[in-house]
Amino acid sequence: MIQIENQTVSGIPFLHIVKEENRHRAVPLVIFIHGFTSAKEHNLHIAYLLAEKGFRAVLPEALHHGERGEEMAVEELAGHFWDIVLNEIEEIGVLKNHFEKEGLIDGGRIGLAGTSMGGITTLGALTAYDWIKAGVSLMGSPNYVELFQQQIDHIQSQGIEIDVPEEKVQQLMKRLELRDLSLQPEKLQQRPLLFWHGAKDKVVPYAPTRKFYDTIKSHYSEQPERLQFIGDENADHKVPRAAVLKTIEWFETYL
């Protein structure tokens, strides 16, 4: 039987999904991050498949989303996008420490994955935590600074004035530089990393992520199988079942 528990640690709500017989055992941990305007329970199908394979799956609630949400228009929420991502990276560490303290992680076998904003978060977290043993980015991007600059350019092209002091913009830019994997690919340390991206994606651009993959392939020359990019020529911003199953398979192989 698969158990689903709604828990909270240090103010972070999350769903904890695991086989009943593994509830108090040390097993591999996979943290899966949801996308923008989504919520933790929207990825229960992925967590179920992970739990079936013997993993402990954890689905955190991102700041300003789901049960942490507020009455906020999408446009207003978008203004908090990078704060949400950077906060989520910090909270991933809190969750890891919790399960580690409880003795529920098997030998440091920890994986991280996410869709869209969750994929972006995953790639940033790889710059922060060397204990992440394997990662999967579904429709994500490592190019934090480039994406942020594109957002600013888009707003300005619409004739909209950015109601934020330039000093704060530059402060955020510096914070993003610290978590921009495209600026420090050596932090991957040849860890297993899978990308899935739809070529017709108009939300998170396909080309920059593909370019990053092509750039880092040389880092994996000794173990090329540990780096994979699946580009779906017919897909847009929606993860198909095949990509979900590949995610499960990736963690089965590398955790």
UniProtKB/Swiss-Prot annotation:
Keywords: Hydrolase. The keyword Hydrolase applies. InterPro entries: AB_hydrolase_fold (IPR029058), FrsA_esterase (IPR050261), Peptidase_S9_cat (IPR001375). It is an enzyme of class 3 (hydrolase). SUPFAM superfamilies: alpha/beta-Hydrolases (SSF53474). One of its GO terms (biological process) is proteolysis. This is Putative esterase YitV. It comes from Bacillus subtilis (strain 168). GO terms for molecular function: carboxylic ester hydrolase activity; serine-type peptidase activity. Pfam families: Peptidase_S9 (PF00326). Its EC number is 3.1.-.-. The keyword Hydrolase applies. It comes from the Bacteria.
